[in-house]
């Protein structure tokens, strides 16, 4: 089920013309989350929702996921919990690579987060992000 934003009716008031429908576009910034009851606009924004947004007539060929504090691990070492978000998003990217969801490569690149105030442990976190994101994370 596709979740609608709290301002869905407002967003639907105007259609914007697609100016260059053949122009390949990479969406450089989006987030994915679920069950975020504190979110002001939309408590859920996952693959179904982003596909609905990007399949609007533009030629969105890929997207870049930016960390947003979602899907962190609840257990294990505190400094490694953010790696859960990379693992989750890498799964979304793998779904898109299958081709079942269309041609757009959602989360073709992932920007994760590391608390750099943890000193030498930051290197371990970066290594774990690289392992979890396979080829999608670059340092």
Predicted regions mapped to residue ranges:
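Conserved small/polar residues in nucleotide/adenosyl-binding loops
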Residues: 138-139
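Extended hydrophobic secondary-structure segments that form protein cores and membrane-embedded regions
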Residues: 64-67, 108-114
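Glycine-rich anion/phosphate-binding loops
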Residues: 117-126
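An N-terminally biased module of ancient metal coordination in phosphate/nucleic-acid-related enzymes
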Residues: 1-102
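A short, hydrophobic secondary-structure junction motif
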Residues: 28-31, 114-118
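Glycine-rich, aromatic-flanked loop segments that form ligand/cofactor-binding clefts
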Residues: 129
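Acidic, His- and aromatic-enriched active-site or binding-groove loops in soluble protein domains
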Residues: 132-135
